[in-house]
Amino acid sequence: MESILALLLALALVPYQLSRGQSFQVNPPESEVAVAMGTSLQITCSMSCDEGVARVHWRGLDTSLGSVQTLPGSSILSVRGMLSDTGTPVCVGSCGSRSFQHSVKILVYAFPDQLVVSPEFLVPGQDQVVSCTAHNIWPADPNSLSFALLLGEQRLEGAQALEPEQEEEIQEAEGTPLFRMTQRWRLPSLGTPAPPALHCQVTMQLPKLVLTHRKEIPVLQSQTSPKPPNTTSAEPYILTSSSTAEAVSTGLNITTLPSAPPYPKLSPRTLSSEGPCRPKIHQDLEAGWELLCEASCGPGVTVRWTLAPGDLATYHKREAGAQAWLSVLPPGPMVEGWFQCRQDPGGEVTNLYVPGQVTPNSSSTVVLWIGSLVLGLLALVFLAYRLWKCYRPGPRPDTSSCTHL
């Protein structure tokens, strides 16, 4: 019985004897690490060995650029916050006949506070579609990125989410395939009284890290709202603003991102605030119905049309760097509604409200013209008949009545 107990005790001490003097550590110890693009992170792998010097090295990444520094008993992997750092490197350590390994999944992400909402304010009592776009993001995965339209701290009930859209951003440097993702909602009636504002909230969920950005969409109130422009006026209604942007990071690594100043107070006619360089929209009345968007913000700036009443594809567009033209196809009367132009890089937008013009109905014009022509012909026939009756051949009639013609 004593021999059996001694054998069991010896077997229980085997793991302790094997691991004695062999400490394998990785810092940070997580198996998944999220790194913001442009930031750096060092992952240290070390091992102690009583039988000499432990051999430790990283494998699975390109080490030709000096991203790995190997020392006796340790190896340091430097992550530079580039998309090429994404992957799963493995640290391997050996001491005598014993070997250990630890894999780390590295995810490089980009989620700047660059939310753009359209329209920039909401008008109660109108059918509206609101869009929210997150720019320069990575990864552009619906499983990682989610959108929400909030009233207060709750999701807006009755808002119909449309299909999200994803496009690749135009980058100055190659090798950084960032994307923009847009979510649109068809809004229900905002009710009376209308809420002061809605919020677009975008959340990126990563391993042990949750990032959130939020942007305000003000709702115009009757006492401070700009009145809709008179449809008979030719003066357009211009809106430029820098809306509130709010960013909060939650999770195991808690970080608070900077937020922008509060939304400027609405004025009875325009809404504007000092901010970055923005595009400007001009209406060319001499060239017929045509809008010109241009930006004087230095070289490398491009502008494009992003919103128009109806379908933007039905308009004629010409884009040339910092200038973009928009006109109706086929040429016709002014279209009433909001037009939006966007500037890249930067994502700044400018909106222009164009009032409709009252044009005569073409069918009514044709009917009036035909009616006038018929009346003229009838008058001519009557005059010809009277002249023929007065001066026809035969017995000379009494022409006293003809003098009244």
Curated annotation (Swiss-Prot):
> Could you tell me where this protein is found in the cell?
Membrane
Q: Summarize the record's induction comment.
A: By TNF-alpha, and chronic inflammation.
**GO:BP terms for this protein?**
integrin-mediated signaling pathway; keratinocyte differentiation; leukocyte migration; positive regulation of lymphocyte migration
Q: Does the keyword Cell membrane apply?
A: no
Membrane topology note: Single-pass type I membrane protein
Post-translational modification comment from the UniProt entry: O-glycosylated; contains syalic acid. The Ser/Thr-rich mucin-like domain may provide possible sites for O-glycosylation.
Q: Where is the Ig-like domain?
A: 22-109, 110-227, 258-357
Supply the alphabetized keyword list: Cell adhesion, Disulfide bond, Glycoprotein, Immunoglobulin domain, Membrane, Repeat, Signal, Transmembrane, Transmembrane helix
Membrane-traversing stretches: 365-385
Q: Looking at the record, which segments are called Mucin-like?
A: 221-257
Q: Which residues lie on this side of the membrane: Cytoplasmic?
A: 386-405
- Provide Extracellular-side residue ranges: 22-364
Does the entry feature the keyword Methyltransferase, yes or no?
no
- According to the record, glycans are attached at N230, N253, N361
**Disulphides:** C45-C91, C49-C95, C132-C200, C293-C341
Task: Give the highest taxon in the source lineage.
Answer: Eukaryota
The annotated region (Disordered) lies at 255-275
Q: Which GO terms describe its molecular function?
A: integrin binding involved in cell-matrix adhesion
Signal peptide positions are 1-21
Tissue expression from the record: Highly expressed on high endothelial venules (HEV) of organized intestinal lymphoid tissues like the Peyer patches and mesenteric lymph nodes, and in the lamina propria of the intestine. Some expression found in the spleen, and low levels of expression in the peripheral lymph nodes and the lactating mammary gland. No expression was detected in the liver, kidneys, lungs or in normal brain. Expressed as well in brain endothelioma cells, and mucosal tissues which are in a chronic state of inflammation, such as inflamed pancreas.
Cellular component GO terms, alphabetical: membrane
Q: How does it assemble?
A: Homodimer.
Linked pathology is: Absence of Madcam1 in the spleen has been found in aly/aly mice, but normal expression is found in intestinal venules. This aberrant expression is a secondary defect and not the direct cause of aly alymphoplasia, an autosomal recessive mutation which induces total aplasia of lymph nodes and Peyer patches.
What is the purpose of this protein? Answer: Cell adhesion leukocyte receptor expressed by mucosal venules, helps to direct lymphocyte traffic into mucosal tissues including the Peyer patches and the intestinal lamina propria. It can bind both the integrin alpha-4/beta-7 and L-selectin, regulating both the passage and retention of leukocytes. Both isoform 1 and isoform 2 can adhere to integrin alpha-4/beta-7. Isoform 2, lacking the mucin-like domain, may be specialized in supporting integrin alpha-4/beta-7-dependent adhesion strengthening, independent of L-selectin binding.
Tell me what this protein is called: Mucosal addressin cell adhesion molecule 1
Query: Gene encoding it?
Result: Madcam1
